[in-house]
C-alpha cells in the first residue's frame, strides 16, 4: 500500500496550556473546522469529544491526553490534546516526547500562568517548535500586547505577533494578518465565516509598525529577508512565510496569533499557522538511539527499519490494553511480530487502531510519522522502544518521569474486593508512570502514591467506577526521603554457620552524599578480592535497602557507594550472603554518618485580588513558605510565587477560598527536596516508631 500523505505533509502537534485557558475548546474547534466532527461539544457542559472520561466530563477539565487526526489544506495533522492541571503533567511530558510541534494556548487576560511555565519548560527540554495562540480575546481585560510581553519576560521566549487584533473584550471582531497585510472580520457563527475587509484606517499605522517588528525579528534567521529589509524593499509574502517557518523550526522564535475559540473567531487562521510554520517529521533532527551501547541516529524514512516509541498505555473496556506509539522509521503491518528492545522481549501486534479520543478505526499498517495504538502488546510499557522483529535492536532515548510526592492508604470495604483492588491498581499503574502502588511492610496496608491530591482523588474514583471497588481512604501523607550528609567507610560482614553449607559475605563500602545525582554505585575491587559475579548482587542489596531507608523507613536518595574492599569464602560465599552484607553496611552507616530526613518543597503560585495581599502572604509565611516572586498582573490581580513544604499545604484550597471570598486560585507542583527542620523530623520519626 502506498503512502496517502507525503511525510512533508505531516504535522504531529500537541495543544498545551494552563488549566482553563481554553485548550480543549480550541481543539474541538480545530476538529469541527477540519470536518473531523460535525457538532461542536463544549467543555463546560461535558460535551467535548476529546474529554471522554466520566471524571473529565463532570469536572470540566482534561485529565488524560487524547489523540486524534485531522486534515487541512492537504496536510495530515495528528493532534494530542493534553491536560492543563499540574497533577497530570506526565501526560504533557510523554506527549511532547513524541510530537514535532505544539500550540501553546494563553488566556488573553492572564497571559502566561503557572502551568504555562511548566509545559513551556517541558517543550523547551524536548526542543519542540511552538506557535502561541492568545485565546479569549473577547474576555474582560484581554490584552494581546501584555500576553506577548509575558511570554518574553516569564518564559524568556522570543514571541512575535504575526497578527494584530482589531478590538478586544466585547469589541473584538477580528485581526489583521501582518504577513499578507489583510484584515479579517468574523461573524461569530460556528462555521467561523471570515470576511476580508480593507484594513481600517485606525489600525493601518499600528499594523505597519508591527509588520516592521516582525520583519526585523525574522531577518536574523534569513539573509535574503535581511538584505531586502536593509535596502528598504518590499518583502514578498512567500519569502516572509518561508523566513517565519525557518525561524520557528529553530525553537528560538515563536509566532503569535490570536482569537477566541469559544466565539468562533481566529481558529482557522491558527490552523493555517500550524500548517505554514510547524515542522513535519522531515524538519526535525534525527532521533537519538543506542545500539550496542553506541549512539545512533534514526532518520525519518519508510525505507529504514521499523522503530517506534510507546508513549502511553490505556485500558479500553472493549479491546483491553491499548499501547499508543509514535513511528520514527519504517513500516509496520497488523499481525506482525515486533521486538521490545527495552525489555528484551518479542511480541506480536494484533490490531492497529487509528484513535479519535476513545473511538477507534482499525487500519492495516502504520508508516513513519504516524501515531497509532496497538492491541496485543502484553509487556510493553510507557517509554519502551519497539522495532521490527528482524531489525537492528536499537533503543531510543528513554523518558524520565518525576517521583510521587504524596500518598494515601487504601482499604477495601470487603475482603472479597481485595483481588479486584489489586487488579485495578495494577492496570492503573501500567497507564500512569507517576502513579505507584505498594504494600506497607509494617502495617500491611495498600498504599497509593502520586503527584497531588487531585491525582489520587481521580485514581480512587476510577477504582470505584471502572473496577467496582469500594475503598476506605486514609488521610494524605507526605512522601519524605532520606539521605546522608557526610562521607564514611563502612564494613558489612555476614557469616552464618549452622550445620551444612554456611554463608559468607564481606564488603567495605565508602558512602558519601551525591547531591541531585540519585544513586551511584562504583566498583573499585581489584585483585579478585570479591568475584565479579557478586558485584551486581552487592549493588542490588544496597538498592533494596535504600528503598526502605535506614532512618524512618523512607526511600534514600542522592547517595554514592564505592565498593573498595572485602573478602570471600570459596565454599560459603553466595549471592544472598553478599546482598545481606551490603544491606548491613548501609544500615551501619546510620551510626557513622549523619542521616537526615528530606521533605518535598512545592512551587506554589497564588493569584488573588490585591486587597487580600496581607492575608495571603501572612498565611504562606505561617506555612513555612518562602516568597520567590511577587508581581501585579495587567488586570490588577496579585500573583505570588513561593516555595512551601508539601506537609503545610493540606487544606490550603479551603483556607484560600475563605481568605479571598472565593476569588483566589492556586497551582502547585513539586520543585525540590530540602532538609526537614530537626524538630519536625524528630516528630515524624517518633510517629513511625523508629528511633533516630
Swiss-Prot record:
Q: What are the record keywords, sorted? A: Cytoplasm, Elongation factor, GTP-binding, Nucleotide-binding, Protein biosynthesis
Xref: PANTHER family: RIBOSOME-RELEASING FACTOR 2, MITOCHONDRIAL, TRANSLATION ELONGATION FACTOR G-RELATED
Gene behind the chain: fusA
Q: Member of which family? A: Belongs to the TRAFAC class translation factor GTPase superfamily. Classic translation factor GTPase family. EF-G/EF-2 subfamily.
Could you give one GO CC term from the UniProt record?
Answer: cytoplasm
The UniProt entry's GO biological process terms, in alphabetical order, are: ribosome disassembly
> Which HAMAP family did the record assign?
EF_G_EF_2_B
Q: What is its main location?
A: cytoplasm
Task: Please give the Pfam families that the UniProt record associates with this protein.
Answer: EFG_C, EFG_III, EFG_IV, GTP_EFTU, GTP_EFTU_D2
Q: Which domain of life is it from?
A: Bacteria
| Job description of the protein | Catalyzes the GTP-dependent ribosomal translocation step during translation elongation. During this step, the ribosome changes from the pre-translocational (PRE) to the post-translocational (POST) state as the newly formed A-site-bound peptidyl-tRNA and P-site-bound deacylated tRNA move to the P and E sites, respectively. Catalyzes the coordinated movement of the two tRNA molecules, the mRNA and conformational changes in the ribosome.
Q: Which GO terms describe its molecular function?
A: GTP binding; GTPase activity; translation elongation factor activity
Q: Where does GTP bind?
A: 17-24, 81-85, 135-138
Q: Where is the tr-type G domain?
A: 8-282
Name of the protein described by the UniProt record: Elongation factor G
Q: Where in the cell is it found?
A: Cytoplasm
Q: Which CDD domains match?
A: EF-G, EFG_III, EFG_mtEFG1_IV, EFG_mtEFG_C, EFG_mtEFG_II
